[in-house]
């Protein structure tokens, strides 16, 4: 069964296949199911880009979308996530997309349910589709991963984006560097080296900025937030020292003038909104992978 839970479960070949499908979709290919197929979006945390790009992807593939609201469901009566997914499975849903505040919520589910789970983000753990859309954006820009230098900058400890990207990009041959306030370093990470931001600015090909996650921080970190932009953000002055041909990325939502100067969000180097566009194509590709009998085999029509 084609769950997509973490980047560690994907081989280089599987990553390449997903990116190839995503590139095909980006270049105008269409794949639509010819039979009614239900998928459910279960978002237990707020989301704009991930939720709506999944929904756009699902509808472009001809899937019937069930949007789940925890506040209006039996979760409020104590129903477990397992029972919720089994209920959806029982009534004919063929895949579920889940975002949940619990790290690795899927460990207790993956061997117990009979439909694919696509992880749309688990706590501070993993965000595989964000990673895949980032990989697609980098590949479109440079045509390769091998030998690239990538700086992942900011709130590394709380970031599922940092974890997924560092692991996948290392596997694909890139060199990863981190720059972070001391309080937000992830000392357990084995996928990169910490260096001062100002040393990295002129060296790296990709400056990947991370959102300061206010909702995951303790109160004692408030003072750091006030001076974050000047000490740890991409200021206009730092952008001027960036390597020729290098790009700016951010998973969004962007805290303007915190992680990045507002005037840089849509500057020539920025690929922030391109990442969002690529999110639809990547999520179409992972849905195709999860539902091969519906979207990858005899029961689909391919329009070029």
From Swiss-Prot:
It comes from the Bacteria. Pathway: Pyrimidine metabolism; UMP biosynthesis via de novo pathway; (S)-dihydroorotate from bicarbonate: step 2/3. InterPro entries: Asp/Orn_carbamoyltranf_P-bd, Asp/Orn_carbamoylTrfase, Asp/Orn_carbamoylTrfase_sf, Asp_carbamoyltransf, Asp_carbamoyltransf_Asp/Orn-bd. One of its GO terms (biological process) is 'de novo' pyrimidine nucleobase biosynthetic process. Carbamoyl phosphate binds at residues 49-50, 99, 127, 130, 252-253. GO terms for cellular component: cytosol. It catalyses: carbamoyl phosphate + L-aspartate = N-carbamoyl-L-aspartate + phosphate + H(+). Keywords: Pyrimidine biosynthesis, Transferase. L-aspartate binds at residues 77, 160, 211. GO terms for molecular function: amino acid binding; aspartate carbamoyltransferase activity. Pfam families: OTCace, OTCace_N. Its EC number is 2.1.3.2. PROSITE patterns: CARBAMOYLTRANSFERASE (PS00097). It is an enzyme of class 2 (transferase). Heterododecamer (2C3:3R2) of six catalytic PyrB chains organized as two trimers (C3), and six regulatory PyrI chains organized as three dimers (R2). HAMAP family: Asp_carb_tr. Catalyzes the condensation of carbamoyl phosphate and aspartate to form carbamoyl aspartate and inorganic phosphate, the committed step in the de novo pyrimidine nucleotide biosynthesis pathway. Belongs to the aspartate/ornithine carbamoyltransferase superfamily. ATCase family. PANTHER family: ASPARTATE CARBAMOYLTRANSFERASE, ORNITHINE CARBAMOYLTRANSFERASE, MITOCHONDRIAL. This is Aspartate carbamoyltransferase catalytic subunit. It comes from Bacillus cereus (strain G9842). The gene is pyrB.
């Amino acid at each position: 069964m084609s769950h997509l839970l973490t980047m560690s479960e994907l081989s280089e070949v599987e990553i390449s296949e997903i990116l190839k499908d995503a590139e095909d979709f980006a270049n105008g290919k269409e794949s639509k199911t010819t039979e009614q197929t239900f998928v459910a979006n279960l978002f237990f945390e707020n989301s704009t880009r991930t939720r709506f790009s999944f929904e756009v992807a699902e509808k472009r593939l001809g899937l019937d979308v069930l949007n789940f609201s925890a506040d209006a469901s039996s979760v409020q009566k104590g129903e477990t996530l397992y029972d919720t997914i089994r209920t959806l499975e029982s009534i004919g849903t063929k895949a579920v997309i889940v975002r949940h505040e619990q790290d690795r919520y899927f460990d207790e589910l993956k061997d117990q349910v009979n439909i694919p789970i696509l992880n749309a983000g688990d706590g501070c753990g993993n965000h595989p589709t964000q990673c895949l859309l980032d990989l697609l954006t980098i590949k479109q820009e440079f045509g390769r991963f091998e030998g690239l230098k990538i700086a992942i900058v900011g709130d590394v400890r709380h970031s599922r984006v940092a974890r997924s990207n560092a692991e996948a990009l290392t596997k694909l041959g890139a060199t990863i560097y981190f720059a972070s306030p001391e309080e937000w370093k992830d000392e357990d990470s084995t996928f990169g080296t910490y260096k001062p931001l100002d040393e990295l600015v002129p060296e790296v090909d990709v400056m990947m900025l991370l959102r300061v996650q206010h909702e995951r921080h303790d109160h004692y970190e408030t003072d750091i937030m006030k001076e974050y932009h000047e000490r740890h953000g991409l200021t206009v002055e730092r952008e001027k020292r960036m390597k020729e041909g290098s790009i700016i990325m951010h998973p969004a939502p962007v805290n303007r003038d915190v992680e990045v100067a507002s005037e840089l969000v849509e500057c020539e180097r920025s690929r922030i909104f391109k990442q969002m566009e690529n999110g639809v194509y990547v999520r179409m590709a992972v849905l195709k992978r999860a539902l091969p009998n519906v979207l990858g085999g005899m029961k689909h029509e391919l329009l070029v």
